[in-house]
Amino acid sequence: MDHLHSSTETTTALPELQWLEAPLMTTQEDVLFPLAWEELACRQVGKGAAPILHVWRHPAALVIGHRDRRLPNAPQAMERVRSSGTSVCVRPSGGAAVMLDRGVLNLSLILPNPQRAISLHEDFRLMAGLIADALAPWSAEAQTGEIIGSFCPGDYDVSVRGRKFCGIAQRRQAKAYIITAFVMIEGHGAERAQAVQQFYREAAGDTPAGVQQPDYPRVNPATMGSLAELAGVPSVEAYTASLRRVVESRAAILPADGSLVQLEGLAEQMAALRERYDLQV
C-alpha cells in the first residue's frame, strides 16, 4: 500500500484543460450517454482539441465491465436491476461493476496521445494524486493499492484506512485516451457493495458440482467506504469545489467548448457502444 503524494510530483504534467461539469443526470437518462459523449470527445482531443476533465453524476446506475457481461446469467441480472429503476450499461473502459448514485462523483481526464506512447502507471498516479489532493482539507491518509474484496478492484484503488472509496480505469483510442475514476463521497460504501455483490450472485448463477465457478470479483461490503464515512467530507459539492481548486493550481482552465460533441452523433455512438460491448458477447 502506497501513501499518495502531491500530483505535482508525478512526471506526467497536467496540461491546460477544459473543466466540463455536467448537471446531475435524471433517473430517466441512460448512463451510457456520458460514456458515449466521452468517446466522441476523446476523438476530438486526438484531433487537437484541448484536453478535458469531465465531471458527472447519475442518480441510479450500474456500470459493468466486459468480463461481467460474459457471466452466464448477466442479461437476466442486468434486466432485474433495470426493473428496479436503475440504468445499466457495459462500459468501454476497463474494470468491473460499479454502483453509481448522486453521492458518487465520476471523473474522466481526456488527454492526447500523439506519439501513441502511454505510461499507464504515471497516468493512474496522476489521477490518484489529484483525487488525494482534493481530499487534503479533510484527510491526508489516502493510499493506493488493491483492496481485496472491493468492487472494481485494481492496483490503483484509492483508500483510507483499508477501505476503498475510489477506483481508476483507462480507455485508449488511436490518438487520445481517457483515465476514468469513480469517487464515493456521500452515502454508505457497504450498501453500494451489497448491490454489486447481489448482481454478481445473480449473474454468475448456480454452478453445478464439479464445474469450475465463473471468475468474478468476490465483493466484501466491509472493504468499501464513502469519504463522508472515512474522512468527514460533508458533500459532493464540497469535494468537487476542492478538486476544482487543485486542478486550477496545476493547470490553466480553458473555456469549455460546448460545440465539441454534436448531439446528433451521440445516439449513433450510444448504439455502437451497446452493439459492441453488450449485444455482441
Residue locations for each model-derived region?
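Generic non-transmembrane alpha-helical segments
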Residues: 76-80, 84, 130-140, 242-250
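Beta-rich nucleic-acid/ligand-interaction surfaces
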Residues: 144-164
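Short amphipathic alpha-helical segments
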Residues: 33, 37, 73, 119, ...
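N-terminal lobe of the biotin/lipoate ligase/transferase fold
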Residues: 1-118
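Aromatic/basic-lined ligand-recognition segments
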Residues: 162-170, 178
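Contiguous, small/hydrophobic- and glycine-enriched helical/loop subdomains that border
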Residues: 104-148
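Long, positively charged amphipathic alpha-helical accessory segments at protein N-termini or as interdomain linkers
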Residues: 138-140, 175-281
